[in-house]
Amino acid sequence: ILGAGSGTRMNSKLPKQYILIKDKPIIFHTIEKFSHFDEIIVVINKKHISFFEKHLNDSGHKNKIKLVFGGKTRIESVLNGLKYIDENSNVAIHDAVRPLISKVMIDKLISSVKNNCVVPGIKLKDSARVFENGKAISINREKIIKIQTPQCFHAKDIKDAYSNLQDFSLTDDASVFEMNGGKIEVVEGEEYNIKVTTPLDLEIVKINYEKL
């Protein structure tokens, strides 16, 4: 679970992953969704350790959690987390600020892993255009999928992909896997599995948390 980001777009003094929903930080709501896993590796910013430890004992999953410090970039944080993964296991890499993911979806994704990468995605509902050379070019929205997390792999495969990584501008693990020759399978995701990035996202998550 990747929770080392600073979340500057949230305009909050408190890092967004530690904002409370029903008296519990977002990151611990997310951890709860993976409570049936054998081990939960949580990657956080070293500067945030006091925020994390404040709620760790109350989580009920202290014995399952392996706490790891993140790097300067997402890629570095993933690499730090992968060091502690058994190569013979399957791994789900998830954003700490996607607390509405369901356990059903997590299990569906992780059980579908073979020699591939399995990711959730949802189709685009709005019209889309690409801005190129000063022009707005219309594109077929049926060909566009918004990719979510968790992104699931056989641990050795994603470790190998990261060890061969050359393009450090990539923004998700599936892209790293694909650049190493891996195949990606997209499973229909969940509309409410949104990433909390802005104050509006936070309000949407709060509203939906009461319903789910």
Predicted regions: what they are:
Residues 1, 27, 81, 94-95, ...:
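Residue-level signal for inorganic ion chemistry
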Residues 1-49:
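N-terminal glycine-rich phosphate-binding loop and ensuing alpha1 helix
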Residues 38-40, 64, 90, 116, ...:
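Residues at the starts of beta-strands that form the adenosine-phosphate
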Residues 50-55:
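Acidic helix N-cap motif at the loop->helix transition within catalytic regions
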Residues 57-90, 166:
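Short phosphate-binding loop-to-helix
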Residues 88-98:
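Short beta-strand-to-loop acidic/aromatic patch adjacent to the donor-nucleotide binding site
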Residues 100-187:
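Conserved core of the sugar-phosphate nucleotidyltransferase
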Residues 193-212:
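Hydrophobic helical membrane-anchoring modules
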